[in-house]
Amino acid sequence: MWVLFLATFCGLGASLTAVDNLGQIGESLGYPNKTVTSFVSLVSIWNFFGRVFSGFVSETLIVKYKVPRPLMMTLVLLLACIGYVLVAFPMPGSLYVASIIIGFSFGAQLPLIFAIISELFGLKYYSTLFNCGQLASPLGSYIFNVKLTGFLYDREAMKDLAKKGLTRSSVKALTCIGSHCYRLPFIILTFVTFFGALTSLILVVRTRNYYRSDIYKKFRENAESL
């Protein structure tokens, strides 16, 4: 469970951080407000597609090819890394692609996490383990969003103020304009998510024999006993 918790902490924590900051990222890169709204809409739309896709595809791979579901989690986290790199090193229009990737990978993680919990640990303590898995999400978001991204963004904004000869007391809110504002935070998020992918890969190795067996046998037996 701790391996899955760590992968969830890294994956969902980084994804929530990216989603929460997407509007401000667009502002920093000079996109108009209407375009920034489009980025948020793209995240929401592809979040839905990610949930449907990961559930359907991972189930098909298990039934037909006995592929461990955690492998799908690994691939989703690696995909998320691409989205973060596009934010850290933006090109013209690249934030559109980043929004799609971030939204898709964020949505894809959720069904996988809770399906993996039920398959590996059963339903007896599912509610407890479910909430433990849920805890990793806000915990990761707080650390990566508030303590990391927010701190580094404010630091870059203060540097911009110093270049203009201004002080913190002379402005109402800190605003950073330029690609440098989110570069370091998203480089760190990329490495954190990659570490989460490696962690989930450990789970793939440890569960490959289990997924080669009839994993739904115990669920059928429980249903028949009712």
What residues fall within each predicted segment?
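Intracellular terminal tails of multi-pass secondary transporters
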Residues: 132, 136, 149-226
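A late C-terminal transmembrane helix in Major Facilitator Superfamily
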Residues: 42, 47, 51-52, 120-161
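Paired intracellular helix-loop junctions of major facilitator superfamily
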Residues: 30-33, 90-92, 116-127, 157
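Structural signature of the two symmetry-related core transmembrane helices
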Residues: 68-85
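Extracytoplasmic gate region of multi-pass secondary transporters
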Residues: 1-56, 110, 114-117, 141-149
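Interfacial helix-cap and linker-helix signal at transmembrane-aqueous boundaries
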Residues: 26-27, 57-62, 118, 148-158, ...
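Helical-face signature of the major facilitator-like transporter fold
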Residues: 7-12, 44, 84, 98-103, ...
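Helix-loop junctions at membrane interfaces in 12-TM secondary transporters
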Residues: 88-98
